[in-house]
A protein has these predicted regions:
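Beta-propeller fold recognition
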Residues: 168-176, 191-203, 360-421, 425-428, ...
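Long, well-ordered hydrophobic secondary-structure segments characteristic of membrane-embedded
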Residues: 71-246, 252-256, 268-272, 276, ...
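Blade-edge beta-strand/turn elements of extracellular beta-propeller
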Residues: 85-99, 107-121, 190-230, 316-334, ...
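N-terminal secretory signal peptides and thylakoid transit peptides that target proteins
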Residues: 27-51
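Loop/turn-rich, solvent-exposed surfaces of beta-rich toroidal or solenoidal domains
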Residues: 528-575
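Signature of short aromatic-glycine-proline-rich micro-motifs recurring in repeat-based ectodomains
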Residues: 120-134, 228-241, 424-435, 525-541, ...
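C-terminal segment of N-terminal export signals and the immediately downstream linker at the start
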Residues: 23-35, 55-90
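N-terminal secretory signal peptides
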Residues: 1-36, 58
Length: 639
């Protein structure tokens, strides 16, 4: 993988570049009938108090709504930027909290830029490419758990060939720098810092012992020579977004786990394994990490079941650094983006999840048992019903349960081959479902659909492109644009204000676009204007007041159809009026991803991943993914 590949391409785009499928791009067949009849381009769709939950949703122009109500945001929006640093509004400041390679424990050396950090310390420092994060208050201490999604091998390996490790030591360093960091932070006279001698500090990486739980645990397809029980895995891979349970545990989400596997031999010929490999994108080459060359666990010819042990949501107790993380197979095996958990009115736990790949699906899991504050929660995520979303053109939808009766698969098979189960029940293909967020002040949820350049595009044979399971990615109401390079955010309200209900109404909160260079569908929805242009919404959190914080991971060329968008950014959205304003811009080449708040909400922590600019140390230094802490100058609440 080249430096340009690593920094500018998503996992889907990398697959498309290196494992191309024939296609013809037909940009003239943009289906705007679905747009015009629903008013997506006339006004943002708002759930009004008078809208029937399963009936027609009210159409409210953002200009009209904003005329009735002044902006709720306590900041002046900033302009798009193209430089190599972070920008925030006037009256706000930012500081670096921690960067890749910074020590987490006493006695660990400071980052050595010339050596890209020492191998011996790579399991004792802050990992690379920060992503989802959550803050926990534990006995008065503020503890952040944060993901490290992947590595830029050309940056963190001194010895490499074409960004590939050349020996087992290099592979081990890469494995150490990924996973999860748990760290205590505190605010002092000089701002925020990591408490290096905290008992909570911990690194979890690609070799940390894990326990497998739920319906897939112990299944033959999870058994290996090293683990004949199929219940004890090593490591958590490609940790993308995050979640937080009501009982105070951290949920880290395994996304593009397929990229770590490969072989110099032939792929397994077993029909079940081969079909699963194809559905999840496991091939001989992987993403050029070359783990399989130096670590037999990742060689699928030698350990063909190992990929089945990854692709899950992992539960971690941040209060106990000696606890064993648990892979919760009941929540399905997909390319998990994040996990948004909420308690239903009857006490059952609901978890929403997106599968981040073109044409994949949106999921919901509802626990069998009820959450009782102070009760035993150790098995709450082991038994429940996993469902997948069907979006109808009349702006209603249904969660379809993935049961043995509905799919013809066993419970264990559903947990291991979740995508196959979802295809069997006719789930709606989506434009790469990313983060899901649940509004804490209104019974509704949102999902970022980041982009899909293959939506509605034809192959050489004249058929519509499909996902890896053969499901056609035709234009549909919730994904209404062909060759969608901008993305959109879908919102739904469950029937009866109950997230455990199987029925919901939906609309599109925003369709990103560029009205300065495009017309029609590609101009975006009415709440997009020259002052808030963005593409590829990815990360998303909703704060305690209901403000939607949208983070992007898209094209930052600032040219052509992306002119005026600048670097990746974070925007604030009002769910009532549809107003969206730009709050932060990241350095060139970086994704803005991961967000949490201090206990008093006077500090916002934001992740800056894979900067191409020499951020944050300046010219001549290696770019380092970092967490920045943002405050208001008057120390009031952020936002």
């Amino acid at each position: 993988m080249t430096d340009i590949d690593r920094r500018t391409l998503s996992a889907d785009e990398w697959d498309e570049l290196h494992f191309p499928r024939p296609e013809v791009q037909d940009f003239d067949r943009v289906v705007d009938a679905a747009l015009s009849r629903r008013g997506f381009l006339r006004g943002v769709l708002v759930f009004g108090s008078g809208a029937a939950v399963m009936g027609t949703t009210a159409l409210v122009s953002p200009q009209t709504a904003q005329a009735q109500q002044t902006s709720r945001f306590a900041f002046t929006p900033i302009a798009a930027q193209t430089d190599g640093t972070v920008h925030v509004p006037e009256g706000y400041t930012w500081q670096r909290l921690i960067s890749w390679g910074d020590p987490l424990f006493p006695g660990v050396a400071e980052f050595d830029d010339a050596q890209a950090g020492a191998l011996a310390d790579s399991d004792k420092v802050f990992g690379e490419n920060t992503d989802g994060m959550e803050l926990f208050v534990i006995g008065g201490a503020q503890v952040i758990a944060v993901n490290h999604e992947y590595t830029n091998n050309d940056v963190n390996l001194v010895n490499h060939v074409d960004a590939k490790p050349v020996d087992a030591e290099g592979v081990r360093k890469l494995q150490n720098l990924q996973g999860v960091t748990v760290m205590e932070v505190r605010e002092g006279a000089n701002g925020w810092e990591v408490v290096k001698d905290s008992r909570f500090n911990r690194r979890i990486d690609h070799n940390t012992p894990m326990r497998l739980s739920g319906p897939a645990a112990g299944h033959d397809l999870l058994k290996t020579e090293a683990d004949p029980t199929g219940t004890a895995a090593l490591g958590t891979l490609n940790n993308c977004g995050s979640g937080k349970t009501p009982w105070g545990t951290y949920l880290t989400c395994e996304e593009n786990f397929n990229g770590y596997f490969g072989t110099t031999s032939a792929l397994p010929e077993d029909a079940v394994i081969a079909a699963g490999y194809k559905r999840y994108g496991i091939n001989e080459k992987g993403f050029d990490y070359d783990y399989h060359v130096f670590d037999a666990r990742f060689d699928v010819a030698k350990t063909p079941h190992e990929p089945h042990r990854h692709g899950y949501i992992v539960e971690i107790d941040p209060a106990d650094p000696t606890s064993t993380p648990v892979k919760r197979t009941a929540l399905g095996r997909i390319k998990h983006e994040n996990a948004a958990a909420i308690v239903a009115p009857d006490g059952r736990v609901v978890v929403y999840m997106g599968d981040d790949e073109r044409g994949e699906f949106l999921y919901r899991w509802v626990s069998r048992d009820k959450y009782v504050p102070g009760g035993d929660t150790s098995t709450l995520l082991e038994e429940g019903v996993l469902s997948v979303a069907k979006f109808n053109d009349d702006m209603t939808g249904t969660w379809v349960a993935l049961t043995p009766d509905a799919t013809g698969m066993t419970a264990a098979e559903i947990a291991i081959f979740t995508r196959t189960a979802a295809s069997k029940v006719g789930a709606t293909t989506m434009d790469r479902p990313e983060w899901v967020a649940v509004n804490p002040v209104s019974v509704e949820a949102y999902c970022c659909l980041t982009n899909n350049s293959r939506r509605g595009v034809l192959t050489d044979a004249g058929t519509v492109r499909t996902n890896a399971g053969g499901d056609p990615m035709t234009v549909n109401a919730v994904n209404p644009r062909e060759a969608n390079n901008y993305g959109q955010i879908v919102r739904w309200r469950p029937e009866g204000d109950d997230h455990a209900s199987d029925a919901f109404a939906w609309d599109l909160y925003v369709m990103a676009g560029n009205p300065t260079v495009a017309q029609g569908a590609m101009a975006g929805s009415a709440n997009i204007n020259a002052g808030n242009l963005f593409n590829s919404p990815d990360g998303m959190m909703i704060d305690s007041t209901g403000i939607i914080w949208i983070q992007t991971d898209g094209e930052d060329s600032n040219e052509g159809e992306f002119a005026g968008m600048g670097n990746n950014q974070m925007l604030a959205g009002d769910p009532v009026t549809g107003e969206i304003q730009r709050f932060l811009t990241g350095p060139f080449g970086a994704e803005v991803t991961g967000l949490t708040w201090s206990a008093d909400r006077r500090t916002m922590f934001v992740g800056i991943q894979h900067p191409a600019a020499p951020f944050p140390d300046g010219e001549g230094k290696r770019p380092r993914s970092s967490i920045v802490a943002i405050k208001r100058a008057d120390n009031a609440l952020v936002g």
